[in-house]
Regions:
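Basic/polar, cationic surfaces and motifs that engage anionic cell-wall
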Residues: 1-24, 44, 119-253
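N-terminal catalytic cores of peptidoglycan-degrading enzymes
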Residues: 1-109
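Hydrophobic faces of well-ordered beta-strands that scaffold small-molecule active sites
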Residues: 53, 111-113, 205-207
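Peptidoglycan-targeting cell-wall enzymes and recognition modules
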Residues: 63-162
Length: 253
């Protein structure tokens, strides 16, 4: 059953998922690197203003998870670099109601996702060489130019399978939490890929670069396309985001 867990409830999602409750899952509860909240879904909706996208600078979700643990951090969702019928695997390490330690001053404003790939082609264009792809069991990534924090970078983009899962996740979270599927835009209508003067004032989707001037994630994504696709999915939504079941909060860890 493909689902994510929000306030103890299973919400259906159209991509392969592994939660901390499942065999092979990654359980951030055991490390206590987060703040726990006992919230109902309605209370969580009231307290949520954003959903934040990150890139991991790791080849796989497992490595990303290990790095977060070693650094005393956490992230609610991780997207692996695999392909299962056109979608990358989504890992959930905590209930969405918890405050993961992943985006500083906005940790309590919303959950986030680490898209697991190595973007830094500006440093090394051989990160996804044939040898490295074989070593880490990951697919090929294309190089694109992206302007982040007013600097144009040569970056490895995430795969289409990862993007497909990103869109599914955003759709499900926005539907469940009544969150606008919209990135911040300037007066000309362009998505802002730099720090915002007041990130907490934007209700909707954010990149880590909107929160911290030292961050350039998520780099290499076509955010206009992602936003448009998610809005189309939401307009035609039939099953994704549906509440499947409810658990007592005592089973969240």
């Amino acid at each position: 059953m493909n689902r994510i867990i929000i306030c103890g409830q299973d919400h259906s999602i159209d991509c392969p998922t592994i939660t901390w409750k499942d065999p092979g899952g990654m359980n951030a509860y055991q490390y206590q690197k987060f703040n726990s909240r006992n919230l109902t879904l309605d209370q969580l909706k009231q307290q949520t203003s954003c959903f934040v996208l990150h890139h991991s600078v790791t080849y796989t979700a497992k490595t990303c998870y290990d790095v977060l643990v070693n650094r005393g951090l956490s992230c609610t969702f991780l997207i692996d670099d695999d392909n299962k019928d056109g979608y990358a695997t989504l890992y959930q390490t905590l209930d969405v109601k918890e405050v993961a330690w992943s985006h500083g001053p906005l940790n309590s404003n919303g959950a986030g996702v680490e898209i697991c790939y190595m973007p830094q082609a500006w440093e090394n264009t051989n990160l996804y060489s044939e040898a490295n792809r074989k070593k880490y069991n990951v697919p090929e990534h294309i190089i694109v130019n992206d302007t982040v924090q007013n600097r144009t970078l040569k970056v490895f983009a995430p795969t289409q399978a990862q993007i497909n899962t990103v869109e599914c996740l955003i759709q499900t979270v926005c539907l469940a939490l009544d969150l606008p599927a919209a990135f911040p835009r300037d007066d000309q209508g362009n998505i802002i890929k730099s720090i915002l003067q007041d990130p907490k004032s934007h209700k909707g989707l954010l990149g880590h670069f909107n929160i911290n001037v030292q961050k350039n994630d998520p780099a290499g994504l076509d955010l206009d396309s992602i936003e448009n696709n998610v809005k189309l999915k939401l307009a035609n939504s039939t099953g994704a985001g549906q509440v499947l079941s409810e658990f007592s909060s005592t089973f969240n860890s």
